[in-house]
Design a protein with these regions (language model features):
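Active-site catalytic pocket residues across diverse enzymes, especially alpha/beta-hydrolases
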Residues: 35-36, 78
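Short loop->beta-strand "edge-of-pocket" segments that line small-molecule binding or catalytic clefts
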Residues: 10-25, 61-62, 121, 125-127
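Conserved PLP-enzyme active-site core in the AAT-like
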Residues: 32
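Secondary-structure end/capping motifs
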Residues: 111-198
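A short alpha->loop->secondary-structure connector
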Residues: 36-44
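Pocket-lining segment of extracytoplasmic ligand-binding domains
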Residues: 29, 47-149
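Long, low-complexity C-terminal extensions of enzymes
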Residues: 191-192, 196-216
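Flexible hinge/capping segments at coil-to-helix
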Residues: 2-18, 110-113
Length: 216
């Protein structure tokens, strides 16, 4: 926020010509270019999931990250930075995708019907239970992170921040009614329209009803 105090969204970064550092092959980047939200020449697909470049350039670039993780890490873990970073959500800039969905092959739906009938409510209850009391699960996540030792830094403080951030930014919550885990078909259609606008390869005959169901 100190580097670009007037920036609130991706269009502001576009207008300033700020480099956007992301992983290669990101669908949202192609969609944002098609929508005019970003310019193709400002996207740098060389992000390596480390803070090194952002810190070396003193925050002159923007980069992808998790709203539930990076703000904490940059302020509390990466001592070379040690201050706030500003964020804007993909969803708020025109990419309302559902993240981390549970998917099956349509051809297997009948075969898996009995299992899904039992399993999906467990998923739903786990979301509710976690956000009512996340301490035990957070401790397990932190422990597993240490055991994997794969380069990702995730502390107890980060886990606590993540829980609060998910609620603050609406990263988790009910669907269009009072049920957690169900999907808004209008939102699915918005994504299909965005994919078509960007000219991405897809089956043009698909409708939201072909892709999601709320029956479980």
């Amino acid at each position: 926020p100190e580097t670009y105090p007037d920036v609130e969204d991706l269009e502001d970064l576009r207008d300033l010509g700020v480099t956007i550092n992301i992983f290669a092959g990101q669908t949202y980047a192609e969609i944002f270019v098609a929508q005019g939200v970003l310019s193709a020449d400002q996207i740098d697909p060389s992000y390596d999931a480390t803070p090194a470049r952002f810190i070396a350039e003193q925050g002159a670039i923007a980069q992808q990250g998790f709203a539930s993780s990076e703000p904490y890490a940059y302020k509390n873990v990466y001592e070379e930075w040690g201050k706030d970073v500003a964020i804007t959500l993909l969803n708020d800039n025109g990419f309302p995708i559902y993240s981390q969905t549970i998917a099956i092959k349509p051809s297997m739906k009948d075969e898996m019907d009995a299992c899904l009938t039992e399993l999906v409510p467990i998923f739903q209850q786990s979301v509710v239970s976690y956000h009512e009391d996340p301490a035990r699960t957070n401790a397990m996540i932190v422990d597993i992170n240490v055991q994997y030792d794969d380069g990702w830094v995730y502390t107890a403080g980060n886990a606590e921040f993540a829980t609060a951030a998910m609620a603050e930014y609406g990263l988790v919550g009910n669907g269009p009614d009072a049920i957690v885990g169900n999907m808004d078909t209008d939102r699915i259609q918005e994504m299909l329209d965005a994919i078509a606008l960007a000219g991405l390869e897809h089956d043009e005959s698909l409708t939201p009803a072909d892709l999601v169901t709320n029956e479980y």
